[in-house]
């Protein structure tokens, strides 16, 4: 997907870089596949901030995405390619032969009118979903299940993919976008291909107001706060006095936060980079 630059007619346009969304074919979503998305503003059940820097922004409707791809051996036709405000990748509306409509993540190169299908004996083509055990080594996949039948959890954002590196018994070794090598059960489903919108990482908002439209509020530096508000606060706003930490005193910027013992450790062949 190409990038769109702007002439610096205003300060907000100077440096702004957008995605050229010429491939989108619909402006409004399929109503039966959407539902309301309540605005949480970063608050938990107790009404207190649980996630900072969230609030405001444009009202959204959530699009129900088919991460499971459990309509096996039923062909479907791509009707539209649409924008989804809840994720970085575009989505595709698929009409299946049994009358059902579902949204799927749109991989790179997916076109309107293309046939997609899921199952154990389907063609190895982009947007088709198969068990990992029947996909050859070296293929790129996305929307990978970690638990059989749970639905895809890995490689779901714009431009991401996992590579099938090897097969060993009942497991398949995947090279994940983070660089981690992980074993996944051969019966877990994955979708062929790399996700589209690969230039999403190269976009620039251009002004703070566009971040506010997305529901992102300002981030205040800890050094600019008072000592009561942050471990790095005080000292005329200039001196740190210690290594970088979170507002709760946890080391950050490179500090490993993964727990020492997790059930999934035995499935990780090599750690993320």
Curated annotation (Swiss-Prot):
Pfam families: Ribosomal_L2, Ribosomal_L2_C. The keyword Cell inner membrane does not apply. One of its GO terms (biological process) is cytoplasmic translation. Residues 28-55, 222-273 are annotated as: Disordered. SUPFAM superfamilies: Nucleic acid-binding proteins (SSF50249), Translation proteins SH3-like domain (SSF50104). The keyword Heme does not apply. Residues 255-273 have a biased composition (Basic residues). Gene3D superfamilies: 2.30.30.30, Nucleic acid-binding proteins, Ribosomal protein L2, domain 3. GO terms for molecular function: rRNA binding; structural constituent of ribosome; transferase activity. GO terms for cellular component: large ribosomal subunit. Keywords: Ribonucleoprotein, Ribosomal protein, RNA-binding, rRNA-binding. Signal peptide: none annotated. Belongs to the universal ribosomal protein uL2 family. Part of the 50S ribosomal subunit. Forms a bridge to the 30S subunit in the 70S ribosome. One of the primary rRNA binding proteins. Required for association of the 30S and 50S subunits to form the 70S ribosome, for tRNA binding and peptide bond formation. It has been suggested to have peptidyltransferase activity; this is somewhat controversial. Makes several contacts with the 16S rRNA in the 70S ribosome. This is Large ribosomal subunit protein uL2. It comes from Treponema pallidum (strain Nichols). The gene is rplB.
């Amino acid at each position: 997907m190409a990038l769109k630059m702007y002439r610096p007619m205003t300060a907000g346009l100077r440096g702004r870089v957008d995605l050229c969304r010429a491939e989108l074919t619909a402006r409004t979503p399929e109503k039966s596949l959407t539902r309301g998305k309540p605005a949480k503003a970063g608050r938990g059940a107790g009404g207190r901030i649980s996630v900072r820097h969230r609030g405001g922004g444009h009202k959204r409707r959530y699009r129900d995405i088919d991460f499971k791809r459990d309509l096996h051996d039923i062909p479907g036709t791509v009707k539209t390619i649409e924008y989804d405000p809840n994720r970085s990748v575009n989505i595709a509306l698929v009409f299946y032969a049994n009358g059902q409509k579902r949204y799927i993540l749109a991989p790179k190169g997916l076109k309107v009118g293309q046939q997609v299908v899921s199952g154990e004996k389907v063609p190895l083509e982009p947007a088709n979903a198969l068990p990992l055990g029947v996909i050859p080594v070296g293929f790129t996949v996305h929307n990978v299940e970690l638990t059989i039948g749970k639905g895809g959890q890995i490689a779901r954002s714009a431009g991401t993919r996992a590579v099938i590196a090897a097969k060993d018994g009942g497991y398949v070794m995947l090279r994940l976008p983070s660089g981690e090598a992980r074993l996944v059960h051969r019966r877990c489903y994955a979708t062929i291909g790399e996700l589209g919108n690969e230039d999403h990482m190269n976009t620039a908002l251009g002004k703070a107001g566009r971040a506010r439209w997305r529901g992102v509020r300002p981030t205040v530096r800890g050094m600019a706060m008072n000592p009561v508000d942050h471990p790095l606060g005080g000292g005329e706003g200039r001196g740190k006095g210690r290594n970088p930490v979170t507002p709760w005193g946890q080391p950050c910027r490179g500090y490993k936060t993964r727990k020492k013992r997790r059930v999934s450790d035995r499935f990780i062949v090599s750690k993320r980079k």
